[in-house]
């Protein structure tokens, strides 16, 4: 290995390997109508009526304040085009994580998906979990190809043993340069409930809520047949209420994305790094904000997401 590659960050090397893997898939296929050009940002492109797709996601989240931290989140999804304007899906969510001296003041801190676990401050911890089952519906009101701008509404309920969520989105899309340049924006409002220790009642647990409010944007340019590349920006906010009050965290992420869409399949990879723009809020956990980055249990330094789908 050259000195240059030896010192390259691991997430960057992994993204490079994924790009080379996708390049080996060939260049002669025709892109499908609903191919997912972004890892985190949704577009208004839907499956045609009667079309079906199996999609697999894998997200790696890496590096906290110090110590050891890795989390893998998986999603296995089946999608169906009810009509040219309505798409539905059903999927399973699962996760694995490990942590050691990664949190505020050097304490071992599990990620949010495992926040119901009681872990000692000096423990070497790891665990796997079935998070829950999700349903999804996307209804497109406007198409960027016939109306000049795309507009769609998204709803996704999730139910699991210790987790509940109702995620909603407004999706906007605008294309330029004969549809070679795709831009998209998502607004997300997602109240969620976790079954956690109840601070007011010793030895008891209760459903406790928070709300995620996110503003995400992306652009992608088709630079060759079936190939596109661009950037994604993810801005996440957490509130200990159902409205814009009692904010605990805000994180800002930015990075490249690359996409290959074949006749019957696609693969997309997105790498994000947290930007040093975070600030303390009224409910921010003490010690979680370091050098302008937030490292509470749902925030980390790097994220790498790979999505692959097959159409039939």
Placement of each model-derived feature along the sequence:
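Hydrophobic alpha-helical segments and their boundary regions
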Residues: 11-15, 39
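Transmembrane beta-barrel domains of Gram-negative outer membranes and organellar outer membranes
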Residues: 32-311
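Bacterial N-terminal signal peptides
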Residues: 16-26
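Membrane-interface motif at the C-terminal end of an N-terminal transmembrane signal
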Residues: 28-30
């Amino acid at each position: 290995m050259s000195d240059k590659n030896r010192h390259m960050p691991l997430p960057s090397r992994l993204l490079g390997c994924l790009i080379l893997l996708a390049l080996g898939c060939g260049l002669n296929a025709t892109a499908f109508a609903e191919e997912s050009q972004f890892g985190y940002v949704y577009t208004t492109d839907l499956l045609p009526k009667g079309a079906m797709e199996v999609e697999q996601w894998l997200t790696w989240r890496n590096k906290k304040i110090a110590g050891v931290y890795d989390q893998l989140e998986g999603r296995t999804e089946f999608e169906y085009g009810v009509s040219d304007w309505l798409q539905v899906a059903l999927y399973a969510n699962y996760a694995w994580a490990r942590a050691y001296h990664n949190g505020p003041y050097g304490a071992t801190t599990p990620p949010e998906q495992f926040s119901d676990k009681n872990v000692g401050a000096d423990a070497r911890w790891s665990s796997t979990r079935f998070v829950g089952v999700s349903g999804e519906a996307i209804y497109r009101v406007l198409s960027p190809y016939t109306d000049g701008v795309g507009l769609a509404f998204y709803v996704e309920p999730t139910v699991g043993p210790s987790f509940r969520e109702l995620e909603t989105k407004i999706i906007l899309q605008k294309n330029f340069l004969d549809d070679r340049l795709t831009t998209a924006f998502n607004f997300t409002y997602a109240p969620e409930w976790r079954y956690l220790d109840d601070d007011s009642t010793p030895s008891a647990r209760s459903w406790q809520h928070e709300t995620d409010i996110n503003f995400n944007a992306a652009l992608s340019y088709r630079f060759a047949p079936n190939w596109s590349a661009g950037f994604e920006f993810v801005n996440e906010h957490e509130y200990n209420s159902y409205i814009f009050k009692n904010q605990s965290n805000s994180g800002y992420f930015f990075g490249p994305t690359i996409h290959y869409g074949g006749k019957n399949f696609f693969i997309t990879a997105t790498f994000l790094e947290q930007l040093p723009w975070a600030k303390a809020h009224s409910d921010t956990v003490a010690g979680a904000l370091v050098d302008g980055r937030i490292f509470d249990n749902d925030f980390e330094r790097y994220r790498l997401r790979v999505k692959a789908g097959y159409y039939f």
